[in-house]
Amino acid sequence: MNHLANNYGYYPQDCRTQYSRMNSAEAELTSLPVHVSLQDRELWDKFSSIGTEMLITKSGRRMFPSCKVTVTGLNPKVKYVVIMDMVPFDNHKYKWNKDCWEVNGSSDPHLPNRFFIHPDSPAPGQKWMQYPISFHKLKLTNNTLNSNGLVVLHSMHKYQPRLHIVQSPDPCTPHNPGAYLRFTFPEAAFIAVTAYQNQEITKLKIDNNPFAKGFRDNGLNRKRFRDKGTQEMQDTDRQVKLDLTANECAAGMSQMVEDVDVSVSSSVDCRDTQNSSSVSLNPFISAFTNPSSAGGAAAHQTHTLLSLSNRHFSSPRESNLNSVCAALPVSQLSTGHTSFSRLNPQETHHNSRPKIQLQPPHPSLQCHDLDVRLPLPPKLSRVQLSESALRNLEMSPLSDCANPRPLTNILNRSCFRASTPSGKLLPNPPQPEQFLRGSEREIYPAVQEYTDQQFTLNSQTEHRPHMRPLTEY
């Protein structure tokens, strides 16, 4: 508690009005029992015990703890102006030596007339006494050229706050000077610094100041430390993204290679090749695995094979046909009841066959190795070929290329069906006999009569005891 008798003073007036120093306003203020007390005295005592420090910057820094005072004894109806400034505590300059402050010479000259006027001034005494007067907006600076109402101090000097209560002059007598009261607070003395020297002061301010977020985390409050940490986090995130992108690209390339290997393996549907359990769902693939499922249609099947050397430019490649033939089960190839030798293109045999409505596979599932997208050959699946027949197909003479024939094999019929609209089938597809002259047609015995016998087609010396007339075809 600062008593009026020890802190009372007069406001220095201009020399022209020195004669009016002792007036009625001064006498009135002197007669009042004005008392001023500093708030948060316990907190100030904690800082004072270890040496209070206050930061000063070029742009100005607020104090913590801030000065907050309570005033009593003022005239409720008289207006007052409340002002605060900082005055030197002593005539010394200080320095921090390891763990304590030491005197380091004489102080620099103090800069006078650096006041902070409370923003509520002037106000009647009733308002000043109603609530504590806070100076939390007061800022300290070391910029001597500052003119924005900041209090200018010297670094490494010790100061103490000083409060001025100035009675406003009477409007009727503007030249009449006003009296003032002055109060100092030694318990709030501090050393002005540009950076905290005592770590205990830093910790104490962090523990008690809810707005000291910048000093948390080991006191790394400067912008360069925050920017450095942010840059390191961004670099780490960027490196992680690059590593993930590289791994995804490598995985994508390996997946593309696997997809290419699967798609060019054969003209068979890739899903049927990879999943053996779904083979029975395709009626054409089921003929390879279960020949008996054809039922009575086996007696009306058509056997038409052409030499691969006579294929058309739009026909599938030889590698694709070999892959289709290689897909036949080995057990069926070895146990077949009928063996075939080399066949010429003109040696064909046709009977009536049931019309089955076929739909070509989806374009996305077809093999890209073919020049023309073809579905799986339906009739080739019912032919039981021996290994010798497959070798003969690959060893066709080159002389057959001189006399090319129309493709009447099973691949031609598949291409013809693929060119028709989906779900439709021509009622009378062209027969291979339409492309052969009458003298080139060969007559074959009925298949039903030789079901249990083995014979060889394309044999020039074969004895044919039962010949049917041409009119039956």
Swiss-Prot record:
| PROSITE patterns tied to this protein | TBOX_1, TBOX_2, TBOX_3
Please provide the Gene Ontology terms (biological process) for this protein.
cell fate specification; paraxial mesoderm formation; positive regulation of DNA-templated transcription; regulation of transcription by RNA polymerase II; somite development
Tissue specificity remark = Exclusively expressed by ventral mesendoderm.
Q: Name one GO molecular function term.
A: RNA polymerase II cis-regulatory region sequence-specific DNA binding
Q: Which residues bind DNA?
A: 43-217
- List, alphabetically, the InterPro entries matched: p53-like_TF_DNA-bd_sf (IPR008967), T-box_DNA-bd (IPR046360), T-box_sf (IPR036960), TF_T-box (IPR001699), TF_T-box_CS (IPR018186)
Q: Where in the cell is it found?
A: Nucleus
Q: Name one GO cellular component term.
A: chromatin
Alphabetically sorted, this entry's keywords are: DNA-binding, Nucleus, Transcription, Transcription regulation
Region called Disordered, residue ranges: 342-361
The highest taxon in the source lineage is: Eukaryota
State what this protein does: Probable transcriptional regulator involved in developmental processes.
Q: What is this protein called?
A: T-box transcription factor TBX6L
Q: Which organism is it from?
A: Danio rerio (Zebrafish)
Q: Which gene encodes it?
A: tbx6l
